[in-house]
Design a protein with these regions (language model features):
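Structural microenvironment flanking redox-active thiols in thiol-disulfide oxidoreductases
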Residues: 95-133, 145-151
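Thiol-/selenol-based redox modules, centered on thioredoxin-like
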Residues: 164-190
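Short active-site neighborhood of thiol/selenol oxidoreductases, capturing the structured segment around
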Residues: 71-91, 100
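C-terminal motif of bacterial Sec signal peptides marking the signal peptidase cleavage site
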Residues: 17-19
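Short, internal strand/loop/helix patches
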Residues: 127-168
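Bacterial lipoprotein signal-peptidase II cleavage site
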Residues: 21-29
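N-terminal "domain-start" segment that seeds a small globular fold
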Residues: 33-76
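Bacterial N-terminal signal peptides that target proteins for export
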Residues: 1-8
Length: 190
């Protein structure tokens, strides 16, 4: 009994240490107005769809150059698309990024595209991290932090988080990291 309790405690600590969440940020950076907390019926329907795994939810956000990027345009052109939710201030995101870069380098020629969705609030922090971490794939951010439209649509509660979407629009993987990500991509992109 003590061993089971100990293992559950260790697992909880490990989960806490390996992801960033809204509560991890300073309270003043995480406040929302009543307007921001209100969602329209289309957003509610989309979030319900994501929760039921009925397929991916399309969204459009500004890219690094300020031009709007639509997820469906990227999904339709690739065998597999990984939507990677991250932020420059997130230590676990930075620790995971070499694995994501390796996956991109190993599988991009086989049909993988990655779309980075940053939960940063400052454009300079976001773009400096993209360069520093060698993230050579499309990047998006509305610079709204945890209030990001995409994060809300996909119920992102902690980062790093990811969603794998095949060309048919089906979600075929979630929150895969390191070797698990590499193995799943190898399986899907034979």
């Amino acid at each position: 009994m003590k061993k089971a309790t100990f293992l559950v405690g260790i697992a909880a600590i490990a989960l806490t240490l390996t992801s960033c969440c809204p509560k991890c940020k300073k309270a003043d950076n995480n406040q929302q107005t009543a307007t921001e907390q209100t969602t329209d019926s289309a957003t509610e329907k989309a979030t319900e769809q994501a929760a039921n795994n009925a397929g991916y939810i399309d969204f459009e956000l500004p890219g690094a150059d300020g031009k709007m990027l639509r997820l469906s345009d990227i999904v339709s052109k690739n065998k597999m698309t990984m939507v990677d939710f991250w932020a420059s201030w997130c230590g676990p995101c930075r620790a995971e990024m070499p694995h994501v870069v390796k996956a991109y380098n190993d599988f991009h020629s086989k049909g993988l595209e990655i779309v980075g969705v940053s939960l940063d609030e400052r454009k300079d922090d976001w773009l400096n991290a993209v360069k520093e971490l060698n993230m050579n794939w499309p990047q998006m951010s509305d610079l709204k932090g945890w209030n990001s439209k995409a994060a809300q649509l996909y119920h992102i509660q902690g980062i790093p988080a990811s969603v794998l979407i095949n060309q048919n629009g089906e979600i075929v993987g979630k929150d895969l990291r390191g070797e698990d990500l590499h193995n799943r991509l190898a399986e899907l992109l034979k």
